[in-house]
Design a protein with these regions (language model features):
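Right-hand nucleic-acid polymerase module
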Residues: 1-188, 198-300
Length: 300
């Protein structure tokens, strides 16, 4: 096991030094070369702790303001929702609530993920982003309380473990949107954003498609692109803001999709669901694991 949680001064500096060590696709190299290069990248990243944030990252004040709006909505709900409002209202910097429904705590978690992922990206420089809407991930409105997020994450992990991509590193985030068609609710759509080690090849795409067959109602169930700097994508993979996705046909007969804010009734279903799971339950790691407050690459 190679500990890659050492804090880099800046992504660009560490990446330049790590890439100077030579090519690595994470699959073809023998284990000795992988271990040596990863260890060297880790030693290059032994720099003072940083306070850097991704460009455009939400401020704590903005997160608190959005959370305050949610608290107002929950206070008008049932007993469970009112208890959640109290929990979120008690959240403090020195005593965080660690709720998956708390914008401030989610922001802290996303920032931790960003910083911990930097040396991993420095060690493995070829990455592909995949957006996946799998069959069976569409849930009825009012049905979120019946979703076992832990079991869902385990299923995603097992599907990747059984695929030809099982030896590659991967970050997988579960996102949630409320889908509408012509202003009629279709349901809660759980979907995946992945950052997976390796170039954006046909082989990688076909492996993802085989592991996650498409949702029949999705217009574009699989989307792939090469990632030059995965550090810019990691926070997008684990989102803190959830939306309605409204599909319609415009005046020219072309299909369109518009992102809209969730309504109060939507939030009263979503927020208790997020609260009942650990804050990192929507994140699946492959070839990487959490060791205390650090992320480490697991050598196999």
């Amino acid at each position: 096991m190679i500990d890659l949680s050492l804090r880099p001064r800046a992504w660009s500096k560490v990446a330049r030094k790590a890439n100077a060590l030579g090519p690595l696709d994470g699959v073809a190299e023998d284990s000795a070369n992988v271990t040596a290069r990863v260890a060297t990248a880790a030693s290059l990243a032994t720099l003072p702790i940083i306070n850097t944030k991704p460009e455009g990252f939400e401020t704590r004040a903005a997160a608190k303001e959005r959370c305050a709006h949610k608290i107002e909505i929950l206070r008008k709900g049932n007993a469970q929702e009112q208890l959640l409002a109290e929990k979120l209202g008690r959240c403090r910097k020195d005593d965080p609530c660690n709720s998956g429904a708390c914008d401030v705590c989610l922001g802290n978690y996303r920032l931790w993920l960003y910083r911990q992922s930097l040396p991993i990206f420095a060690a493995r420089h070829n990455w592909t982003r995949a957006s996946v809407i799998p069959a069976g991930f569409l849930k009825a409105f009012d049905g979120l309380p019946n979703v076992d997020l832990s079991a869902l994450a385990s299923m995603i992990d097992k599907r990747l473990a059984r695929s030809s991509l099982r030896k590659r590193l991967a970050f997988v985030g579960i996102d949630i949107s409320l889908n509408l068609q012509d202003n009629e609710i279709v349901g809660w759509q759980l979907h995946l954003y992945m950052l997976i080690e390796g170039e954006n090849t046909l082989r990688l795409q076909e492996a993802i498609k085989a592991a996650f067959p498409p949702e029949p109602t999705a217009k574009v169930p699989h989307k792939f692109d090469e990632v030059n700097d995965p550090s810019n994508r990691i926070t997008y993979l684990f989102k803190a803001i959830f939306k309605r996705r409204s599909r319609y046909t415009d005046a020219n007969g072309r299909p369109r999709t518009k992102g809209l804010p969730l309504k109060d009734s939507d939030l009263r279903e979503l927020l208790p669901f997020l609260d009942q799971h650990p804050i990192g339950a929507r994140l699946i790691l492959r070839g990487i694991r959490r060791n205390g407050s650090r992320l480490v690459i697991i050598n196999k």
